[in-house]
């Protein structure tokens, strides 16, 4: 009996010892899991922060509206050309010296020169990268233009008897049409030029005068970055750079779009709060304060707004 009791006691002790060992192992295992889970969470957090920083790097900020591929963003796939070209008048550009303020990548500038036959057109933009894009597009257009010239020359020079083509194809054309034809065959690189420039702060008023000046979707960015004073400076410089009777074509952004872009920089956020001159007063300012004589709403005659460019376009005459 005594032995049996001793054996039972020893067995219970061993069971308790085993249970204690198991519980200790369990605690240790749990303790080991905690830092592992914490490490995993930390690693996940670090990866999340890394991804966020990558996203921030990828999300470029354009405080001057100098968006990359701006025209691709604004023009829909089913549009063959910039719809604003349809409201511009040929007589404002044909054989004229023109200036495009805030030209971005130069697509609109080049198309105006090609379609309307400018004598010269200069595109200026504050962003070096956009001007580089503009030069690239110009070289591309010139190559395309030059690739068609040999066949045109051949067809116009073959056959003195007119079987293959007349030697004087412009005889039956009006003077305006003949001028347009000569402008189209002229190398675009001799007509179009681009340069980096902060128009508000650096434009020298002793420079050449222009017959037509464009400022398309630019006023908001001047306004947000330089306030009311910067906007008045822009309008005043444009007026002084225009020839008498010259045309200023403006596409102002509505006030609502100011609100959407006010936080692109500390400067724009600060200026947004102090702006007094709203876009609905621009006509009054340009006519009564700056000195333009007349204004024409170019978009009022359109039956419907084109997708991407549904803003008002105004033409002021000096």
Curated annotation (Swiss-Prot):
Keyword Translocase attached: no
Composition-biased stretches (Basic and acidic residues): 16-34
Entry keyword Zinc: no
Enzyme Commission number, as recorded: 2.1.1.-
Keyword line: Methyltransferase, S-adenosyl-L-methionine, Transferase
Comp. bias regions, Low complexity: 37-52
Pfam families tied to this protein: Bin3 (PF06859), PrmA (PF06325)
A Gene Ontology BP annotation from the UniProt entry: methylation
Region (Disordered): 1-61, 146-184
Listed GO MF terms: methyltransferase activity
Residue stretches making up the Bin3-type SAM domain: 82-318
Family, similarity comment: Belongs to the methyltransferase superfamily.
Job description of the protein: Probable RNA methyltransferase.
Stated name of the protein: Probable RNA methyltransferase At5g51130
């Amino acid at each position: 009996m005594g032995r049996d009791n001793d054996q039972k006691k020893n067995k219970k002790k061993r069971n308790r010892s085993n249970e204690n060992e198991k519980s200790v192992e369990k605690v240790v295992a749990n303790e080991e899991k905690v830092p592992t889970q914490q490490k995993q969470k930390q690693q996940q957090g670090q990866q999340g922060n890394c991804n966020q920083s990558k996203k921030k790097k990828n999300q470029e900020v354009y405080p001057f509206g100098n968006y990359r591929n701006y025209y691709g963003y604004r023009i829909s796939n089913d549009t063959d050309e910039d719809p604003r070209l349809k409201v511009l008048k040929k007589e404002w550009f044909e054989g004229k010296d023109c200036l495009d303020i805030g030209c971005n990548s130069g697509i609109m500038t080049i198309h105006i020169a090609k379609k309307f036959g400018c004598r010269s057109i200069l595109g200026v933009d504050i962003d070096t990268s956009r001007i580089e894009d503009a030069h690239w597009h110009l070289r591309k257009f010139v190559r395309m233009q030059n690739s068609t010239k040999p066949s045109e020359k051949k067809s116009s020079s073959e056959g003195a008897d007119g079987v293959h083509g007349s030697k004087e194809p412009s005889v039956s054309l009006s003077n305006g049409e003949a001028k347009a034809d000569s402008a189209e065959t002229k190398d675009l690189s001799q007509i179009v030029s681009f340069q980096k420039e902060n128009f508000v702060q650096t434009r020298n008023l002793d420079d050449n005068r222009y017959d037509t000046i464009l400022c398309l979707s630019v006023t908001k960015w001047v306004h947000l970055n330089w306030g009311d004073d910067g906007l008045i400076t822009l309008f005043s410089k444009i007026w002084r750079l225009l020839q008498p009777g010259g045309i200023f074509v403006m596409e102002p952004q509505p006030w609502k779009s100011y609100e959407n872009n006010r936080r692109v920089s500390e400067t724009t956020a600060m200026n947004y709060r102090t702006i007094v001159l709203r876009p609905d007063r621009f006509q009054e300012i340009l006519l009564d304060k700056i000195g333009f004589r007349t204004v024409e709403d170019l978009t009022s005659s359109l039956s419907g707004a084109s997708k991407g460019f549904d803003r008002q376009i105004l033409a002021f005459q000096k």
